[in-house]
Structures are given as C-alpha cells and as structure tokens.
Amino acid sequence: MKVRNSLKSLRARHRDNRLVRRKGRLYVINKVQRRFKARQG
C-alpha cells in the first residue's frame, strides 16, 4: 500500500477505484486491480 498526499489523482487512474474513509484516514481501494491500493494521512 502506498501513502500519498493526493488521492484524487490516484483515483482517476482506474475506473474501479473507490475512495473510502476508515478510522479518519482516506483510502483508495480497487477490487479488480489490487495494485492501486493507497492511503492518505
């Protein structure tokens, strides 16, 4: 999992990316291409 400053640009890289908030942190998850996992904060 990558830690990034801006998740909005990462989310646009694949159409199956989802932006999720868990425990005060923002995550990008992707069930199809798991290599797009990232978090912020």
Swiss-Prot record:
Which InterPro entries does this chain map to?
Ribosomal_bL36 (IPR000473), Ribosomal_bL36_sp (IPR035977), Ribosomal_L36_bact (IPR047621)
Can you tell which superkingdom this protein's organism belongs to?
Bacteria
What keywords sit in the KW lines? Ribonucleoprotein, Ribosomal protein
Molecular function terms in GO for this entry? Answer: structural constituent of ribosome
Q: Some GO term, biological process aspect, for this entry: which one?
A: translation
- Which cysteines link up through disulfide bonds? none
Q: Could you give one GO CC term from the UniProt record? A: ribosome
The family note in this entry says:
Belongs to the bacterial ribosomal protein bL36 family.
Q: What is this protein called?
A: Large ribosomal subunit protein bL36
Q: Which organism is it from?
A: Rhodopseudomonas palustris (strain HaA2)
Originating gene: rpmJ
